[in-house]
Structures are given as structure tokens and as C-alpha cells.
Amino acid sequence: MIFIRIIRNYFFKLGHVVCARTVKNFAKSEQFISKPGPRSIGNILLADKICDGKLFVFGNIFELGDKVIWDHSLSSIENYEELHGFPWLDDLAARGDKAAVEIVQKWVFSWIEKYGSGSGPGWTPRLTSRRLIRLIHHEDTILNGLSEKYISTYFKSIYKHANFISKRFYKTDKLTMNFEAIVGVISVSYTHLRAHETA
């Protein structure tokens, strides 16, 4: 029984990898019809530590220095994969000042550059849905003052996330209810996307 479960989980993960790398990221729209707005609450005290170059994660302090989080070797951190669900985005968005916004933008777009093509440990239905929900909730913070190039990159990533979840949320261990993956799909469906209007 255990062996069968291991084999099944292996093929689930393999399927996630293949899907993440092949799913389309072409976004026909660059705007939400309904303004999503933040619905998750962060911790300003944790954001303060991040702005000071320290990440409080799973009971430990991780020294960031001046580097973007994804430039560090994170495998030594227990459950480091959870960072790919972007829990820190809630905290930084709650603080919301210039320093926090700059970190948000650096971390989000460096993640997209490094892992957005479908690589890394973050492409599971659970983590992808958590990440997608937060990316949608904190759109204003992420895109604050950025150019059309970054806006386009953001919406392409949103499209890829939603496309991945729609194909993979049911391909998971039946013992783990993937409620968040379903919520991720609903979030995109609810907010909708429409073609960006140009003058």
C-alpha cells in the first residue's frame, strides 16, 4: 500500500512538472474587470524583519542581506517549499510603504524570471493556488508604478498559473483535499480578465 502511494505521488509530481513547463502563458488581457483587492491579512512585524534583511520563517531567522530571497540556497530551511506560496507577500503588502513595495516587486518578478517557466518546487496545485490567490489579492502593490512591460509579465504569469491549476488541481493525492486550488481557479473566474484598453 505504501509502495503504491509512493509510485502514485511520483507520477503526480512528474505530471505537475510536465504541465508547468508546457502550459500556456499567453495572456489576452492585462486588466481585471473586477478589482480584486487584498483579502488576506499579513503581519507587519514580520514585514519589518524582512525590510531589515531578515526573514522569519518556521520559527527561525534567515539572514537575507541585500540579496533577493531566490538568490539564496533555501533547501536548508525546513519546509522551504512553502515560501513559493508567497506567504511573505501578505506581510509586506500589510506594511505597504515604499521599502516593502520595492521588496515585493523584486521578489515577485525575480521569482517569475527564475521559476515562471515551470521550474522549481513551487509548481504543485497547492502552492500554485496559494501563490495565485496572493498575486491577485495584492495586484496594486505588485504593479505600483511599474511599466507596461512588467504589467504584461504579471498578467502572463497569472494566466499560466490559472491554466496550470485548471489542468492539475484534480491530479493530486485523494487524501489531500485541494480546496485552495479550486479557490485559485474561482478567484480568476470571479475577477475575470479583459483586454487592456489602449488609447
Residue ranges and their predicted role:
Residues 1-173, 179-186:
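Extracellular glycan-targeting catalytic surfaces
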